[in-house]
Regions:
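Membrane-interface helix-start motif
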Residues: 12-14, 45-47, 243-248, 324-325, ...
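Extreme N-terminal signal-anchor transmembrane helix of membrane signaling/transducer proteins, especially
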Residues: 14-45, 53, 355-360
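Cytoplasmic juxtamembrane amphipathic helix immediately C-terminal to a transmembrane segment
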Residues: 17, 23, 40, 44, ...
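Juxtamembrane membrane-water interface segments immediately C-terminal to a transmembrane helix
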Residues: 41-75, 81
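Short N-terminal helix-loop-first-beta-strand/juxtamembrane motif that initiates sensory/input modules
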Residues: 72-93, 99-107, 138-171, 197-199, ...
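Extracytoplasmic/periplasmic ligand-binding sensor regions of membrane-associated signaling proteins
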Residues: 129-250, 302-307
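Extracellular/periplasmic juxtamembrane segments that couple receptor/chemosensory ectodomains to their
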Residues: 280-352
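Amphipathic coiled-coil signaling helices used for dimeric signal transmission
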Residues: 388-389, 402-434
Length: 449
């Protein structure tokens, strides 16, 4: 099937123009895309590192302050164990128990346990209102302590239990009755008494059925007058949320950024969002945020139920963790978190703007490329049409192209070529006419002869 000249022109024009536009796009858009992608990746990296370093610094500072708060609380509580009257009464109790008969003591303990459960007023009175109880109450309320050594309002309010046991774990004094009478088998008692050697025991957060709340406890051995042997244990239980909240809940940034306290098993001790006692759902996060050194890490989830990647700053509480490691084998860690949506919001906005800018640039390149290609293709088309006319000998006027480049020079060369062809054709016609005249003359001469 024949193709019309116009169709050929359009095919040539469309193909060349398309190639020129495609070449311009490749030359222009590839470096642009590479630059934009590199800028986005670098910005993402910078934001992640800046946020990570900031989260780490916040975790370290908050952890340091909370570490000091707990150390101060431990020091103030330990002062109760140094009270001479408490030591005297417990030494007397020790001597009685060591000199007594074990079977008799066992029977007596059963009766006392029964009386405690039944809340016998005569039995409760010496424990909750006796000399030791009054000393405890005085220290608890700050009436017998120096002002700078008394418990703060916050820790006093967070205290849920404060009591003393003897060398057998039996209750000697308490500020109320919502505590067990026998404690010898309790892990905190075994750890603090430590077979008579004595050591500070800091228990992890757990739900206390008697106190009906999540608590952590501090247990300190009461040593005899020469500091040689433990003669009892002072046990203090705190409402975990109420104790930690003043140091943790007040720290926030952005809409969701906050700090929280967890142990090395991922149990939440205090958090403005998660309930105390809850375990972090994603177990993959726990080892990433509970090393023995401060730092920050990208995590597969945010530790708060979200599944998006996040950045978490962390640090152990050094002094407190030394005690908890000896006590329960776990450490306490400060954890700084912000929702993934808010954390990566600036990056997503940056990506959106980069995509918009890239789309606009792509459109501009197509538009400018089309205009530029048209300016190149149009004079070439004129030259193509002129070449066809020259082939037919029909080009009567010179080609006028003013592009100021090689195409204009090519048009001038085509004009010169056309002039030379016309001159050659004229000479050829003149020569042909001369030869034709000679032939006619010879023919006429031949006829006459």
């Amino acid at each position: 099937m024949a193709t019309s000249p116009d169709s050929g022109k359009m095919t040539f024009h469309s193909t060349l123009k398309r190639k020129l536009i495609l070449s311009m796009l490749l030359v222009g858009i590839l470096p642009l895309l590479i630059g934009l992608v590199m800028a986005f990746l670098q910005a993402r990296k910078e934001i992640r590192e800046v946020n990570g370093a900031s989260f780490q610094a916040l975790a370290v500072e908050t952890g340091r302050k909370l570490d000091l708060v707990i150390k101060e609380e431990e020091a103030k509580t330990r002062r109760i164990t140094l009270d001479p009257e408490i030591i005297r009464i417990l030494e007397e109790r020790r001597d009685v128990l060591l000199d007594g008969d074990e079977a008799t003591f066992k029977d007596q303990l059963e009766h006392e346990q029964e009386a405690w459960i039944k809340k016998d007023p005569k039995f409760l009175q010496p424990i909750t209102q006796g000399p030791l109880a009054k000393i405890l109450e005085g220290h608890y309320r700050g009436t017998i302590s120096e002002k700078d050594l008394s418990f703060t309002v916050v820790t006093r309010s967070a205290t849920r239990a404060l009591y003393i046991t003897d060398i057998m774990g039996r209750l000697m004094a308490s500020i109320h009755t919502k505590v067990p009478y026998t404690n010898k088998e309790a892990s905190w008692w075994k750890g603090a008494f430590n077979k008579g050697i004595g050591q500070t025991y800091l228990e992890n957060v757990a739900f206390d059925n008697l106190l009906d709340t999540y608590t952590f406890s501090l247990s300190i051995p009461i040593m005899d007058s020469i500091g040689y042997q433990a003669i009892g244990v002072l046990h203090r239980a705190y409402d975990a949320k109420e104790f930690f909240a003043p140091s943790i809940d007040i720290i926030g940034f952005g809409k969701t950024g906050h700090v929280m306290l967890i142990d090395s098993q991922g149990i939440v001790l205090s958090c403005p969002l998660l309930p105390t006692g809850k375990r972090i759902e994603d177990a993959r996060v726990i080892p990433l945020v509970t090393p023995r050194h401060p730092g920050w890490a990208p995590t597969p989830s945010d530790g708060h139920g979200g599944t998006e990647t996040s950045i978490i700053g962390f640090t152990p509480l050094p002094s407190v963790s030394r005690i908890t490691q000896q006590s329960t084998g776990t450490a306490w860690h400060m954890f700084v978190w912000q929702s993934s949506e808010e954390l990566y919001g600036p990056i997503q906005n940056l990506f959106t703007w980069i995509a918009v800018f890239g789309a606009i640039s792509f459109g501009l390149l197509i538009t400018l490329g089309s205009i530029s290609a048209g300016r190149i293709v149009t004079p070439i088309r004129r030259l193509q049409a002129a070449a066809k006319l020259i082939g037919k000998g029909e080009l009567r006027e010179p080609i006028v192209i003013k592009t100021g480049d090689e195409i204009e020079e090519l048009a001038d060369e085509v004009n010169r070529m056309n002039q030379q062809l016309e001159s050659a054709f004229k000479q050829l016609k003149s020569h042909l006419a001369s030869k034709t005249a000679e032939v006619q003359y010879l023919q006429e001469s031949t006829i006459q002869i």
